[in-house]
């Protein structure tokens, strides 16, 4: 678990947010700064449990080949730890039943694998490895109230909700869509960063289920996507630890899957390929659907 880091430069860095972006940023900064402090307003469970500050935690997550390789370089041994905890390898062509553009995609050995797991499992394993570094501290239940610095000149740290100030040579905001950095910067006399907004009218609902997929006969991926523009629905299923599957159903331009069990099943029944609907019928739900 212990990792060696090269000699750091003088100064501290502060990272706001202990999600995947914040954890990865902190790992890189640990090689360049004497001390890195990661702050998150959530409690951070020691076990793979969902938390309020990660709204996507209840939806599917996978590591594609290059992303996994990068994380493995940053956190040696991460892949083996995830697999030992139940993450599932799948060949993206051989182990996938994909209906798209009017037919099934051919299945064959590709040698291209992705690793499927729940977001809480991935985040927990990465955070544990980050916390093993001697110059990194992760502080849970710690809300940031604003930035500190010389107005119009520079940012030199953060102020916490309780009034404590943490000086920093670099502040990284990885707090996600709830970021307040634009307002904090304006309060210090800086212009807010330019913002680009792309409206995507896509909606999706996810249900976690437990059991086997008889159609695949093992871990694999199911995808059913209708042909645009006349049809707007899609569905996907991915295996994760604990003999469970994330099943996501969605649509575009106002077409969305219901969260109740009957409506969710009916939406799956209307997809062009029956594999996802069959998976739902042959498994048991774990908790409620999340939109």
Task: Cite the ranges covered by each PLM segment.
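N-terminal Rossmann-like FAD-binding beta1-loop-alpha1 element of flavoenzymes
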Residues: 6-39, 43
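Active-site substrate-recognition segment that forms the wall
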Residues: 223-254
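Short hydrophobic core segments
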Residues: 16, 144, 158, 166-178, ...
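Central beta-strand plus flanking loop segment that forms part of the substrate or channel wall
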Residues: 186-219
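FAD/FMN-dependent oxidoreductases across multiple families
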Residues: 116, 255-291
């Amino acid at each position: 678990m212990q990792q060696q880091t090269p000699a750091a430069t003088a100064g501290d860095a502060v990272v706001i947010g202990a999600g995947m972006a914040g954890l990865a940023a902190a790992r890189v900064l640990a090689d360049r700064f004497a001390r890195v402090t990661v702050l998150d307003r959530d409690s951070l469970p020691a076990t793979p449990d969902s938390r309020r500050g990660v709204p996507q935690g209840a939806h599917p997550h996978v590591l594609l080949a290059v992303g996994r390789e990068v994380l493995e370089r940053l956190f040696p041994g991460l892949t083996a730890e995830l697999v030992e905890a139940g993450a599932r390898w799948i060949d993206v062509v051989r182990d996938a039943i994909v209906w798209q553009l009017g037919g099934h995609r051919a299945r064959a050995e590709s040698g291209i694998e992705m690793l499927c797991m729940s977001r809480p499992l991935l985040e927990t394993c990465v955070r544990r490895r980050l916390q093993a570094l001697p110059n990194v501290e992760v502080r849970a239940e710690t809300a940031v109230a604003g930035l500190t610095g010389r107005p119009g000149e520079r940012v030199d740290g953060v102020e916490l909700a309780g009034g404590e100030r943490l000086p920093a040579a670099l502040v990284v905001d990885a707090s996600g869509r709830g970021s307040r950095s634009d307002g904090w910067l304006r309060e210090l006399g800086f212009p807010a960063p330019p913002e680009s907004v792309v409206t995507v009218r896509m909606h999706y609902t996810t249900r976690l289920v437990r059991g086997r997929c008889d159609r695949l006969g093992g871990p694999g991926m199911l995808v059913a996507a209708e042909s645009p523009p006349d049809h707007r629905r899609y569905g996907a299923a991915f295996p994760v630890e604990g003999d469970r599957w994330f099943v996501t159903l969605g649509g575009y331009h106002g077409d969305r899957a219901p969260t109740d069990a009957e409506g969710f099943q009916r939406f799956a029944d209307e997809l062009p390929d029956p594999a996802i609907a069959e998976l739902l019928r042959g498994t048991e739900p774990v908790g409620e659907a999340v939109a």
